[in-house]
Amino acid sequence: MLFTDEGKSEKPFPYLLVNLVLVDLRSSFPNLLGQLNSPEYESISTRLASAFDVVSAFIGFLVRFLEYESAENSISSLMMAPDLLFKLRQSIAETLSLAIEYLRDRWDAAEAGAMGLHPDARLGAANTSRGSHFTLAWDSKIDRASQDPLILAAVRALAIWLREDENDMLRMEAAGLTDMLMDLYRSSTEDGARLDFRSPVLVALEGTTALEDGAASLLDHNGWEVLTQDLLAILRSSSSASSEDEAARGIEIVRVLIPTVERESPGSREAWMAVVTAVAAWDVPDAEQPPVVCEFQVAVLQLVTALMENTHSGMQRRYVHSISAVLGIVEQLMDKIVKIHDEALEDSLRDVESTLSGLR
């Protein structure tokens, strides 16, 4: 395996490889914006995207290995000494911090012109006493930022690290990219989109929304509207089709939204309750479906439960008919899940049923 080392060298190959890749990335960022329209940019972008892919693969390997580490299979014996691993951790965090700066600068130049500028105030006609003209953007003449494989590779590597490494400082820095992340998510749903940023964006949001400021930034940049629109579209489509990839993305959306709901004070916003109404009107399919699709459907019901539980009694009384409809959905799903013998999903559904029944 690429990231294992059977030898006893002082600095094993995995350490040297990843360290070299990180050095290449850090040294490339300062001049990257100035090369956007150069003939060499395509090859530079491909090289750096590959470098980020190596970093992503290393982080993924490290996470999986630590999950299954045992006394006979210690990380120091298979991979590298703990002190070298600590150095790599610091180096990865430093590199990704620089990547955040680059992504911010690239996105501002391409789309906004100022950090976090609201979408309504971006590129468009500027009305002056001399007439209307369009505001400027500085970006590649050939490809938009949302079509650059380097941006996708960078976001993917950053996302995995944000979720797996509890580095609040880096998460705070990344929370400043929330407007960019939501724009990339939206662009991935457009017809003809060349790259799909949705899954990496959701993974990144898992990390940033662990902080209160990150969750607030998500809401400030229309994150709730964007994510719930996609979530409900997946739910509706699951009535007639069973896309496991779509269902997996829906589960990731719920992972982001439930902590946001639970953190909201003094309770769920009234606009959010549209999700409850939409789910209550959903038709449960009769056909047997893959386990991941059932898991997604249960996750949506858990989101509804979180919304209802975190609101005041007056709001709960207003939605009593929706609660009854959702409980009917719970009953139908339970009949299906019992047949696939998934005890964890059964327990989750019972929790949903118990909580919602107590709110009527």
For the regions a protein language model found, what residue spans apply to each?
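Extended alpha-helical scaffold regions
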Residues: 1-360
